[in-house]
């Protein structure tokens, strides 16, 4: 049970890292999105926490792939939300569809991992 909670924490940190890296790039390089220091702070703290987890815990088989998928999901979700808020950037159809596909893929992989652990 404790390992499952640690795995979920790693996946959540990867999602937040994806959100914050896209937010940082949007805040720094997009003239449409207003500047904010909070995505930068969030990115630094998230990367630090992920690095500490990497140093202090072993990652089970399959978790790095799920963490990468959660990171990509965070990037896509931020892009979808920003494009919905600022339609001048472009359509959010493609990131929204990819986000839904990623959510279902992550859910299927997590369900398979849970069944493998139960056996």
Swiss-Prot record:
<keyword id="KW-1003">Cell membrane</keyword>
<feature type="transmembrane region" description="Helical">
    <location>
        <begin position="9"/>
        <end position="28"/>
    </location>
</feature>
<dbReference type="Pfam" id="PF07226">
    <property type="entry name" value="DUF1422"/>
</dbReference>
<dbReference type="InterPro" id="IPR009867">
    <property type="entry name" value="DUF1422"/>
</dbReference>
<feature type="transmembrane region" description="Helical">
    <location>
        <begin position="62"/>
        <end position="84"/>
    </location>
</feature>
<feature type="topological domain" description="Periplasmic">
    <location>
        <begin position="29"/>
        <end position="31"/>
    </location>
</feature>
<keyword id="KW-0472">Membrane</keyword>
<keyword id="KW-1133">Transmembrane helix</keyword>
<keyword id="KW-0997">Cell inner membrane</keyword>
<feature type="topological domain" description="Periplasmic">
    <location>
        <begin position="85"/>
        <end position="88"/>
    </location>
</feature>
<protein>
    <recommendedName>
        <fullName>Inner membrane protein YijD</fullName>
    </recommendedName>
</protein>
<dbReference type="GO" id="GO:0005886">
    <property type="term" value="C:plasma membrane"/>
</dbReference>
<feature type="transmembrane region" description="Helical">
    <location>
        <begin position="32"/>
        <end position="50"/>
    </location>
</feature>
<keyword id="KW-0812">Transmembrane</keyword>
<feature type="topological domain" description="Cytoplasmic">
    <location>
        <begin position="109"/>
        <end position="119"/>
    </location>
</feature>
<feature type="topological domain" description="Cytoplasmic">
    <location>
        <begin position="1"/>
        <end position="8"/>
    </location>
</feature>
<feature type="topological domain" description="Cytoplasmic">
    <location>
        <begin position="51"/>
        <end position="61"/>
    </location>
</feature>
<feature type="transmembrane region" description="Helical">
    <location>
        <begin position="89"/>
        <end position="108"/>
    </location>
</feature>
